[in-house]
Amino acid sequence: MYDQNHLAHRLRRASLGREDQLFLEHLVTGRETTYGQFFANAERLATGLVASGVQPGDRIAVQAPKTQIMLELYVATVLCGAVFLPLNTGYTASELRYFLGDAQPRLLVCDPRRAADLRAVADDCGVSGVLTIGVDESGTLADLRDAHQPGFAPVARAAGDLAAILYTSGTTGRSKGAMLSHGALASNAQTLRDYWRFTDADVLIHALPIFHTHGLFVATNVTLMAGGSCLFLPGFDADAILDAMPRATALMGVPTFYTRLLEAEGLAEAARGMRLFVSGSAPLLAETHDRWRAVTGHAILERYGMTETNMNTSNPYDGERRAGTVGFPLPGIEVILTDPQTGAKVPQGEVGILEVRGPNVFSGYWKMPEKTAEELRENGFFITGDMGQIDADGYVHIVGRSKDLIISGGYNIYPKEIELLVDDLPGVMESAVIGVPHPDFGETVVAVVVPEAGATLTEDGVLAGVADHLARFKQPRRVILVDALPRNTMGKVQKAEMRKTYADLFA
């Protein structure tokens, strides 16, 4: 079934012949949807999309609440050979103007509450039509689905054909549209399914957003390719997740999920029967890893990926899940470390730029051939921009982004080294180390620190706490105490924002 469509075939084949198996239970509404019902709805939508003028290769932009019908729309888009373009629900109309103008989608799907504002933007950008879907799953998208019957014949798509465009977070400069092929998405989900031992007996708690790689191409694709089930939440809800754990086997989350769940009563009992906890999208503190293990008896499995590649490395399912690392390269994926100036491989144990090659790597940046050539080598290696080390046991350590590297007085300083020391100080919840302009050194080190609740921290105390452990040129010149670090919607600390905030500290 769906044999001619590379990705759709692989999303469907695990559930063939098991139409009555539960695919999704919505934990807010209580509605249950079987695999047969889910794919029938996707086929209805695919028919409706084609009737609305969607052609193979057209983009379908989506900025709407997390609902089941959005997953149906994703599969429907794949079925009709179009390109799925999910957009962060936090983007303003002004921000959407850039994405719609750049991608030039055929259709935009949005929340009915924003339709009036976004129609004007869509019209200006040449979008042919606007469909709506609300958090209650009512709207013109649902009407389009319900007006058609199942039985859609999928459009033929090969492994190299485009399946999705995901825009990078754009924390520094213009967002880039990463083009992801049928083959890239299919191969990565199949690899993760096997590496993490997902089967049709698994029940995943799905609380991640679906405009992002983690929630859409990892959580959703892996579940579909395993023929498993998911317990579906519109967003993170600690109480709902705890209530669901006794019926579930796996949870995928960002570090914030785990820190908040650690504050909840009853975690140890709720998690007792779980099989797997996965963390990604932002670094997991070793302290969180250790506390989680102490409370639940489970070791969180941390992995490493990005918009352009999906997942690259993972701590092992069997074997030591080492805190502070992102494990080993996944099967079929090569990871090397190179010198940022020369491009030559660096010796084992030294810091270098992580480069990745494999079937998971994107096809390039949408309408940015020069940027593609800069970051995607002719030999297939993608220059991630992340700084890393590979230890003697083969575990990959992420040191930071190359753009976060601090060069002070001619010395290279890696923020992660300082952050680990600061985070270990009594009374520190977390920290972020940045470089800011300095009249003498070009750049200098500033530590932005969040104290633990009730702790009494001082700038002098933090400086004294790291002084004996760091060379003088690495020691922070200033410590800024704050209530919270700025983060994006996936929990990543926004160092670019902090660099702007404190740019004049030494002016």
Label each residue range with its predicted role.
Residues 59, 65-85, 89-93, 101-107, ...:
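A short helix-loop-beta submotif of the ANL/AMP-binding
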Residues 32-36, 163-187, 494:
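Conserved AMP-binding A3 loop
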Residues 186-203, 211-250, 264-265:
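Conserved AMP-binding/adenylation subdomain of ANL enzymes
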Residues 20, 148-167, 174, 197-203:
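Conserved pre-ATP/AMP-binding loop-to-beta segment of ANL
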Residues 28, 113-159:
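ANL superfamily adenylate-forming
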Residues 91, 108, 358, 363-364, ...:
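AMP-binding/adenylate-forming catalytic core of the ANL superfamily
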Residues 23-67, 71-75, 92-97, 183:
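Conserved AMP-binding/adenylate-forming core of the ANL superfamily
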Residues 245-253, 262-322, 334:
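Gly/Ser/Thr-rich phosphate-binding loop
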